[in-house]
């Protein structure tokens, strides 16, 4: 079984059960790569360009500090029913004590964010989050349709909601393929934000949209400065960015403006669901400055 926390923590959990674990015929390897711009986002050949440092360790738990160039984060590993051993510069191997092994891996920019929960706690949180998502959101039933394609269409609708929620509803506008893979070198393209997230308020999932709407408010001043540099008033949103909201190097992307109206449209859809004066007050400046440009 595999699950993610689904209630605000970056934790993955795995639960394994096999006689092969008990007999030591199999073990679990956890390896950390260097970053890359290709589709996997991983470079396994540059061992000397990143660091994996053990800060705390015991048989079942280990806290790591990871450094890649100027980026750093913490990783906590909890192997319930097992032993963790470091084998190489960036490689851990986990052996089971018996036929059952539960592993959880927590990641965070701060040390306390890497404090691991048990795999069962993570799976319980995942179930609660999943229940909230499906009970709150909209659904379409096609079971009474006579069209032979109805069942497959319904399956795809359900699957699409799940995939878009887990891959594209984080705290920043998603990159072009969300978290599925590392397309366009991991950059976010704001004209794609609409295609990833506009469905959320239409399907009663506006709370998931709120996560990334906050990014626009936090970077409004940068958008104003971007417009001013070009001789305009208001806020000009860049096309291709990293999380900082600054135009990525390109001979064409900084000239494009097709991403500009998306945020106004999505705020309007979110407001139609909320009908909340506080929401208007919180986002009015964002709408006005974007429209002024």
Q: Can you say where each PLM-predicted feature lies in the sequence?
A:
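Conserved hydrophobic/aromatic pocket- or pore-lining residues that grip, position, or stack substrates
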Residues: 160-163, 196-197, 263
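Acidic/polar, glycine-enriched structural segments that form the non-catalytic walls/loops
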Residues: 1-187, 206, 217-224
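Generic hydrophobic, aliphatic-rich segments that mediate packing or membrane embedding
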Residues: 12, 156, 192-193, 212
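Helix-terminus loop motifs that line ligand-binding clefts
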Residues: 164, 168-191, 204-265, 271, ...
């Amino acid at each position: 079984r595999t699950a993610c926390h689904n209630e605000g923590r970056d934790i993955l959990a795995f639960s394994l059960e096999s006689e092969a674990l008990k007999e030591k015929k199999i073990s679990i390897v956890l390896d950390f790569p260097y970053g890359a711009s290709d589709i996997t986002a991983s470079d396994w050949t540059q061992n000397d360009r990143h660091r994996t440092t053990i800060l705390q360790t015991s048989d079942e738990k280990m806290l790591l500090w990871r450094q890649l160039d100027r980026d750093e984060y913490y990783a906590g590993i909890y192997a319930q029913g097992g032993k963790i051993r470091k084998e190489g510069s960036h490689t851990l191997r986990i052996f089971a004590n018996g036929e059952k092994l539960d592993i959880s891996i927590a990641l965070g920019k701060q040390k306390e964010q890497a404090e691991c929960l048990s795999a069962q706690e993570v799976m319980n949180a995942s179930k609660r989050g999943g229940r909230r998502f499906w009970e709150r959101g909209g659904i379409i039933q096609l079971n009474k349709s006579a069209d032979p394609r109805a069942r497959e269409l319904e399956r795809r609708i359900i699957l699409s909601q799940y995939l878009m929620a887990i891959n594209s509803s984080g705290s920043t506008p998603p990159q072009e393929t969300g978290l599925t893979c590392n397309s366009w070198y991991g950059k976010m393209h704001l004209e794609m934000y609409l295609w990833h997230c506009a469905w959320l308020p239409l399907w009663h999932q506006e709370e998931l949209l709120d996560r990334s709407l906050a990014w626009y408010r936090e970077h409004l001043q940068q958008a104003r400065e971007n417009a001013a540099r070009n001789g305009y008033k208001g806020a000009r949103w860049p096309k291709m960015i990293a999380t900082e909201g600054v135009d990525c190097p390109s001979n064409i992307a900084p000239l494009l403006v097709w991403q500009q109206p998306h945020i106004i449209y999505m705020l309007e859809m979110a407001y139609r669901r909320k009908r909340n004066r506080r929401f208007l007050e919180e986002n009015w400046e964002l709408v006005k400055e974007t429209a002024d440009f």
